[in-house]
Amino acid sequence: MPIIRANTGIVTQINVFTVPEGGQDALIDYLAEAAKFASTTPGWISASLHRSRDGTRVVNYAQTESPEAAKQVIERLRDGGWLERNKAFGQAHPGLYDVVFTLER
């Protein structure tokens, strides 16, 4: 389950993919399998996939316990060929983030 609280030390990777028309489902299926693969990495917390309503984007919101764990997850995915293969589904725009503010009702 995602943890969205400020100043926890948790690292959030937000990766926005642009996909060709009709390409969301294939990418979502692929990213779900990649998340299952990554989930056994120490420090991995969660992955959440989002589809845009206009059909042009998929967002992967993934969390790890620390910067070191984020690096391990990325290296494991790279070594397993997952990062190279995802290029067939769309263009990735990844970034690592820290939550700095939240507001809840």
Where are these regions (language model features)?
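An amphipathic, aromatic/His-enriched active-site/gating alpha helix that lines ligand/cofactor pockets
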Residues: 2, 6, 33-45, 63-97
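Short, surface-exposed ligand-recognition loops at beta-strand->loop->(often short) alpha-helix junctions
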Residues: 16-30
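Solvent-exposed, flexible loop/coil residues
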Residues: 48, 93, 105
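Short, well-ordered beta-strand segments in beta-rich or mixed alpha/beta enzyme
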Residues: 11-18, 46-77
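Short, low-order "capping/linker" segments at domain edges
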Residues: 98-105
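Hydrophobic transmembrane signal anchors and adjacent membrane-proximal interface regions, especially
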Residues: 56, 84-85, 101
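Surface-exposed coil/turn segments at beta-strand junctions on protein surfaces, enriched
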Residues: 6-8, 20, 40, 53
